[in-house]
């Protein structure tokens, strides 16, 4: 039987600037903060911060997720970030404001939402 190797503690990186990716859907918001090479420094989602079900899609849940990810990134020495926002969700602006409120300096905001050139058929309208 193969012996399990012991993993060492996670090494703290000293990363002064990075990129924050905010993926905001109707059901959840995921905030990932990377270094300039694209290696993940910290991440958080509305679900990982304790929200369940329909509450994950709210702007407040996005704010909490952004604050959590930003706090972890600042522990690794991050000061400046570029923000890439993707998706149509409710938590887009709130997540950006939360990143700014934690003390990170935002140098750039870019919308990278993929727009189809008439690709897949969208879901039908809800009738309640």
UniProtKB/Swiss-Prot annotation:
Domain of life: Bacteria
One GO molecular-function entry: rRNA binding
GO annotation, biological process: translation
Keywords: Ribonucleoprotein, Ribosomal protein, RNA-binding, rRNA-binding
GO cellular component: ribonucleoprotein complex; ribosome
PROSITE patterns for this protein: RIBOSOMAL_S11
InterPro entries reported in the protein's UniProt record: Ribosomal_uS11, Ribosomal_uS11_bac-type, Ribosomal_uS11_CS, Ribosomal_uS11_sf
Functional note: Located on the platform of the 30S subunit, it bridges several disparate RNA helices of the 16S rRNA. Forms part of the Shine-Dalgarno cleft in the 70S ribosome.
NCBIfam families for this protein: PRK05309.1 (NF003698), uS11_bact (TIGR03632)
Subunit structure: Part of the 30S ribosomal subunit. Interacts with proteins S7 and S18. Binds to IF-3.
Family the UniProt entry places it in: Belongs to the universal ribosomal protein uS11 family.
Stated name of the protein: Small ribosomal subunit protein uS11
